[in-house]
UniProtKB/Swiss-Prot annotation:
Annotated Pfam families: TatA_B_E
The protein's name in its UniProt record: Sec-independent protein translocase protein TatA
Intrachain disulfide bonds: none
Any Gene Ontology biological process: protein transport by the Tat complex
Similarity comment text for this entry: Belongs to the TatA/E family.
Taxonomic placement: Bacteria, Pseudomonadati, Pseudomonadota, Gammaproteobacteria, Oceanospirillales
Function (record text): Part of the twin-arginine translocation (Tat) system that transports large folded proteins containing a characteristic twin-arginine motif in their signal peptide across membranes. TatA could form the protein-conducting channel of the Tat system.
Gene that encodes it: tatA
HAMAP family from the UniProt entry: TatA_E
Subunit structure: The Tat system comprises two distinct complexes: a TatABC complex, containing multiple copies of TatA, TatB and TatC subunits, and a separate TatA complex, containing only TatA subunits. Substrates initially bind to the TatABC complex, which probably triggers association of the separate TatA complex to form the active translocon.
Record's subcellular location: Cell inner membrane
Record-annotated membrane-spanning stretches: 1-21
Organism (species): Marinomonas sp. (strain MWYL1)
Record key words, sorted: Cell inner membrane, Cell membrane, Membrane, Protein transport, Translocation, Transmembrane, Transmembrane helix, Transport
Length: 72
C-alpha cells in the first residue's frame, strides 16, 4: 500500500501533525487547499470551453446496424 506505508504509519504521522499544528490550523489549511484546487479546475474548464468553442465542428455519422443471428 503506497510504497510500503501502512495505515498505522499514516495515523502516527497524522497524530503528530495534529499535536504540532492543532486542528484549527489543519482545518484552515485543508479549506485553503480545497479552494485552490477548485479555482484551478474552474480555470482549466474555462480554457477548454474556450478552445472547444473555437474548433467545434459537428459531425454526422450515418451507419446501418447489422444484427448477427448466430446463437451459441
Amino acid at each position: 500500500m503506497l510504497g510500503g506505508i501502512s495505515i498505522w504509519q499514516l495515523l502516527i504521522v497524522l497524530a503528530i501533525l495534529v499535536l504540532i499544528f492543532g486542528t484549527k490550523k489543519l482545518k484552515n489549511l485543508g479549506s485553503d487547499l480545497g479552494g485552490a484546487v477548485k479555482g484551478f479546475k474552474e480555470a482549466v474548464d474555462k480554457d477548454t470551453e474556450a478552445e472547444d468553442g473555437k474548433t467545434a465542428q459537428h459531425k454526422v455519422i450515418d451507419a446501418d446496424v447489422k444484427k448477427d443471428d448466430k446463437s451459441a
